[in-house]
From Swiss-Prot:
Family: Belongs to the GatB/GatE family. GatE subfamily.
GO-annotated biological processes: glutaminyl-tRNAGln biosynthesis via transamidation; translation
UniProt keywords, alphabetically: ATP-binding, Ligase, Nucleotide-binding, Protein biosynthesis
Leading EC class: ligase
Name used for this protein in its record: Glutamyl-tRNA(Gln) amidotransferase subunit E
Catalytic activity: L-glutamyl-tRNA(Gln) + L-glutamine + ATP + H2O = L-glutaminyl-tRNA(Gln) + L-glutamate + ADP + phosphate + H(+)
SMART domains, per database record: GatB_Yqey
InterPro entries: Asn/Gln-tRNA_amidoTrfase_suB/E (IPR017959), Asn/Gln-tRNA_Trfase_suB/E_cat (IPR006075), Asn/Gln_amidotransferase (IPR018027), Asn/Gln_tRNA_amidoTrase-B-like (IPR003789), GAD-like_sf (IPR004115), GAD_dom (IPR029351), GatB_C_1 (IPR042114), GatB_Yqey_C_2 (IPR023168)
Assembly mode: Heterodimer of GatD and GatE.
Species in which this protein is naturally found: Pyrococcus furiosus (strain ATCC 43587 / DSM 3638 / JCM 8422 / Vc1)
Physiological role: Allows the formation of correctly charged Gln-tRNA(Gln) through the transamidation of misacylated Glu-tRNA(Gln) in organisms which lack glutaminyl-tRNA synthetase. The reaction takes place in the presence of glutamine and ATP through an activated gamma-phospho-Glu-tRNA(Gln). The GatDE system is specific for glutamate and does not act on aspartate.
EC id: 6.3.5.-
Length: 628
């Protein structure tokens, strides 16, 4: 696709970043950790209620229509009555509130005078109570970027949802260990006008969160959502963007999708089709496929299913049009139908999947299609097939109007997939169990006086004060090893060596061993051995490899087991003598030109057990002695 002029297409992007806080649960003194232990389960059915506006949210209504029962797994340690919705909430947790206020100040926001909790209706089963508690903590923050200022209108403190374990036909199993973990939600204004600008803003916010040292790390602890729109398109909410580097890719692909949907709309209008032309009429074409070679259809017919069809006037050639790499308008139709059937067939992709040209022609004839018309088939039990085709009809009508507002899921390749309609504003009503929380001037002053340093400022300080490479400083800060780095320097380790081990050696081991098993005490233990002259710096890598595999060991135990404790000078001289005697003729011929060869041979014998400088000094002495 040709390069997109984002200013011309009127790109607007807003970010929503959710990050778990590393404190107790928000409304109960239960530890905020995950567990695979299950001691008991309980069931719930959830129903939508009206908001304070007297309206029912469309996304909540769609979930209710699925008619699901929710089963919750819990254990005796984490299965608190608050989060089973059996007793009123306590709190909120003071530490979580203070961390949220720290984040607010780091993002140049103004804390509110009083915190009022609201209930946000959520009935997909992820909240036992059928709602999520959320409150605005601060407003009017901002992030400066090379493209301009991006506002942060709200910073909220809310509860995380239960985690999904299994989805069955009419049942969903959740585990409530994650339910109630404090979650800070940071929303920006839609003042982001370039994909790379979105990445810059997300990184700055991420840096501010990490600076507090009170946010959780690891898979599932951070969720980034995007709101993307273009001129003539629609606001699309994209959920679950995990990686920072994928943000520009996802935005670019969403712009591409909307531009192509607008092209399809324009072509449909040019062909003179209106939403009213797409009738909710289902044609039973089962007889055409009674002897079909299509395994999918044959299997369904054998179970008593049917093949139903709808006609889509003037859609020929457009259902198969690519709107994102590897995704077509037909994919959008299929995504909508997926709540009822695994997939659909459309005329732009047929003959295929065992469906023959002859069968296609028979369907076209039965539906009395004209040259520009298309059709969609669904094979399933009759009522299910009708429900699936109704979803396709809705999406086809939307295609004539343009881009529908939706909540979509980010896919690993940067594309997106339909999840549900965009939630309305009819989701909130006041939380009557939690009184307002006053943010006192004393609390504000105390938090402002103890704000942590932002990561970028720390990187610049390390480069200036310790003279280390900027990329090393960035790695140390990004890996949250900055406090450890400063402790090592206080222990007497040279900054250059500490930086090299933390940013190069440890980083290099990531693909080989689980370095997350290496604790700060392991690292400090290895450096103590080095400072005491017991190991060479070449031994760090071997020690860390072993500690990653066996974290129950100490650095000293590994050094002894692996024979990595330093050789005495006398032992080194003995090894050098052995190698020199082996290559004496080469030394006589080349003199100092044999230095590289001899050093290499000696180091293979003593690596990790002798200081490189000492080895070099002894080898030079020996070569000079022989070559005169």
């Amino acid at each position: 696709m040709e390069k997109i002029n984002y200013e011309e297409v009127g790109l607007k992007v807003g970010l929503e970043i959710h990050r778990q806080l590393d404190t107790k649960k928000l409304f109960s003194p239960v530890p905020s950790k995950l567990s695979d232990d299950v001691d008991f389960t309980f069931k719930r059915r959830l129903r939508p209620t009206m908001s304070e506006l007297g309206e029912i949210d469309p996304a909540a209504l769609e979930e209710f229509k699925k008619g699901r029962t929710y089963i919750y797994e819990a254990n005796n340690e984490l299965g608190d009555l608050v989060y089973m919705d059996e007793e009123p909430p306590r709190g909120p947790d003071e530490e979580a509130l203070e961390v949220a206020l720290q984040i607010a100040y780091l993002l140049n926001a103004k804390p509110v005078d009083e915190v009022y909790y609201m209930r946000k209706i959520v009935i997909d089963g992820s909240n036992v109570s059928g709602f999520q508690r959320t409150a605005i903590i601060a407003t009017d923050g901002k992030v400066e970027t090379p493209w301009g200022t991006v506002g942060i209108p709200t910073i909220c403190l809310e509860e995380d949802a239960a985690r999904i374990i299994e989805t069955r036909d009419r049942e969903v199993i959740y585990r409530i260990d994650r339910l109630g973990i404090p979650l800070v939600e940071i929303s920006t204004t839609p003042d982001i006008h370039h994909p790379e600008q979105a990445k810059v803003v997300a990184k700055f916010i991420g840096d501010a969160l990490r600076a507090t040292r009170k946010v959780k790390r690891g898979l599932g602890t951070i969720r980034q959502d995007l709101n993307v729109s273009i001129k003539g398109g629609a606001r699309i909410e994209i959920k679950g963007v995990q990686e920072l580097d994928m943000i520009p890719v996802i935005i670019e692909r969403e712009v591409q999708r909307q531009l192509n949907l607008l092209k399809i709309r324009d072509e449909l209008r040019k062909r003179g089709v209106t939403p009213e032309d797409i009738k909710e009429e289902f044609y039973d074409v089962t007889d055409i496929f009674k002897d079909t070679k299509s395994k999918i259809i044959a299997r369904i017919l054998k179970k008593g299913g049917k093949v139903l069809a709808i006609k889509l006037p003037k859609f020929k050639g457009l259902i198969g049009m690519e709107i994102q790499p590897g995704r077509r308008l037909g994919t959008e139709f299929a995504d909508r139908a997926k709540k009822y059937v695994p997939g659909i067939f459309h005329s732009d992709e047929l003959p295929n999947y065992g469906i023959t040209q002859e069968e296609v022609e028979k369907v076209r004839k039965l539906l009395e299609l004209e040259e520009e018309d298309a059709f969609v088939l669904v094979a399933a039990q009759e009522e299910i097939a009708k429900k699936a085709l109704k979803e396709v009809i809705i999406r086809a009508r939307e295609a004539i109007i343009g881009v529908p507002e939706e909540t979509r899921r980010a896919l690993p390749d940067g594309n997106t997939q339909y999840m549900r309609p965009l939630p309305g504003k009819a989701r909130m009503y006041p939380e009557t169990d939690i009184p307002p929380i006053r943010i006192t001037e004393e609390m504000k002053r105390r938090i402002k006086e103890n704000l942590p340093e932002l990561p970028q400022a720390k990187v610049e300080k390390y480069v200036k004060e310790f003279g280390i490479d900027k990329s090393m400083a960035q790695t140390i800060v990004d890996d949250e090893r900055d406090e450890l780095f400063e402790e090592l320097i206080e222990m007497g380790v040279k900054p250059s060596l500490a930086a090299s081990i933390l940013a190069v050696v440890l980083k290099g081991l990531r693909k080989e061993v689980p370095i997350e098993n290496i604790t700060e005490e392991h690292i400090k233990g290895a450096f103590r051995l080095y400072l005491e002259g017991k190991i060479a710096k070449e031994a760090f890598e071997e020690i860390f490899k072993e500690l990653a595999q066996h974290p129950e060991k100490t650095a000293e135990e590994v050094a002894q087991e692996k024979g990595l404790t330093l050789l005495s000078e006398e032992e080194v001289r003995k090894i050098v003598d052995e190698v020199v005697n082996q290559y004496i003729d080469v030394i006589k011929e080349k003199g100092m030109g044999a230095m590289g060869l001899i050093m290499g041979r000696v180091m293979t014998k003593v690596r990790g057990k002798a200081d490189g400088k000492l080895v070099s000094q002894i080898v030079k002495e020996k070569i000079r002695e022989i070559s005169g």
